[in-house]
Amino acid sequence: MTHTTLFTSESVSEGHPDKVADQISDAVLDALISQDPNCRVACEAVVKSGMVFVAGEITTNAWADVEQITRNTVLQIGYNDPHLGFDGETCAVVTAIGKQSPDIVMGVDGREDQELGAGDQGLMFGYASRETDVFMPAPITYAHRLVRQQALLRKNGRLPWLRPDAKSQVTLRYENGKPVAADCIVLSTQHSPEISQESLREAVIDEIIKPIMPPHWLDKHTRFLVNPTGRFVIGGPVGDCGLTGRKIIVDTYGGMARHGGGCFSGKDPSKVDRSGAYAARYVAKNIVAGGLADRCEIQVSYAIGVAEPTSISVETFGTGKIDEVRTQQLIKEHFDLRPGKIIEELNLLRSIYKATATYGHFGREEPEFTWERTDKAEILREAAGLAAANVTN
């Protein structure tokens, strides 16, 4: 008997106000970590109308022009015209930055790298599945690709009436756990006032949605909701206040997997909210790529100042090819999840973070995304005593 379900995920463009804030936070981190790999950064941003407020705790020997970094980031996104209500050239930039608490420093720094203590307590999740070629859930994968296509057509001038702010939402129909069709696709994009809604709808469907979505998923039952309110001229930080760390489900698995609650952007890799989540994805992806399971969710947890995880757990949703206890043993044998070793293994002391702040931290194929490697898949497969797996990444 066929079991049919629907699942929905959303994404937002680089011009969405929350993503503007994320990119500013990670641009500041990149500028500092490129000079001082051992910097300690917790950088938050708030954007609204003509103002950006950058605050946080930073301890470093490096120097960064936070105001200019902020302006450059806003301009690169596309907010470069006063008529948009938010312009990187003219917006006010206010900063309030202190140093990391010495109580935290005492528990984190001053040790051998492999014994680097976790920068805070917390729990993180990593997930992978065989739904897509990047081992990610299909709804979030295609939601990201839609808003990325919107940005591409805006920047290359093909659809010159597009503006930076946009959102996508993809609802897929699943049969027996596998995606088979698109039930509903929502694309809301900011636009200049002169474009008619009829022309906008036609262009969005033909130029953004259809080139991205698999054609066999689109049928007469698929609903296309393009700018459902009928108008989206006012957008970006004029329409809504943006805040770092407010799109954590967009950043991860679109709701298909659990989330520990900590955001990523603006945090150096001593913060396990970020490095622990990247490592958990690395573990889960290698387990699935190695054929040990078709779906895998990893949870890891830490205590502040302690290097060893307080727990590691695995869930394969009934798709595991070996016992989960054995899978957990293999994780402990082949992955060192102490923060210092994660940083070393994944080469995280680099200025790679601004690129992660848009279109998801996972399922990316750029070489900077080292946690997407499947270099341990074959090792795990052999250790589990399984036949050769089809590893595509």
UniProtKB/Swiss-Prot annotation:
Keyword Disulfide bond on entry: no
Localisation = Cytoplasm
Give me the reactions it catalyses: L-methionine + ATP + H2O = S-adenosyl-L-methionine + phosphate + diphosphate
Q: Which keywords annotate this record?
A: ATP-binding, Cytoplasm, Magnesium, Metal-binding, Nucleotide-binding, One-carbon metabolism, Potassium, Transferase
Instruction: Write out the residues that bind Mg(2+).
Output: 18
Region of interest (Flexible loop), ranges: 100-110
Cross-referenced PANTHER family, in alphabetical order? S-ADENOSYLMETHIONINE SYNTHETASE (PTHR11964)
Recorded hits in HAMAP family, A to Z, give:
S_AdoMet_synth1 (MF_00086)
**Stated family:** Belongs to the AdoMet synthase family.
Q: What is this protein called?
A: S-adenosylmethionine synthase
Organism classification: Bacteria, Pseudomonadati, Pseudomonadota, Gammaproteobacteria, Legionellales
Gene (UniProt): metK
